[in-house]
Amino acid sequence: SMGGHGAFYLAFRHQDVWGAAGSMSGGLDIRPFPNNWDIAKRLGSYAENKEAWENNTVIKLLYLLDGKSLNLIFDCGTADFFYDCNKRMHQALLERNIPHDYTERPGAHTWEYWTNSIKYHLMFFDDFFRKN
């Protein structure tokens, strides 16, 4: 959810601190949701503060990535309301030749989906920490 956005946001901006980041069903583009999660309280309304929204949505921060210093994993269920923005993030990373682990599978924004998804994230991070 928004924790996935936060994890990627912090990792993208602080690659000297983070070597890997993961997101399950993440809101990787906040712009389609201008009235949700009190984001407007922090960034101002989208209509009046588009630049702030552009500067703080993860999908627009890919220019910070060199494709070498950060290991990424993310996934989303095909019935999740964040599915489209995850698919767009995957495409944008592919276009920039940035390595990442992306999975989409049946499921929605539910604990049932995340209970399955977490297993793959744990394997990813286990591999990352064993190598580093």
Task: Describe every region a protein language model picked out.
Residues 1-132:
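Non-catalytic cap/lid and distal C-terminal segments of serine-dependent acyl enzymes
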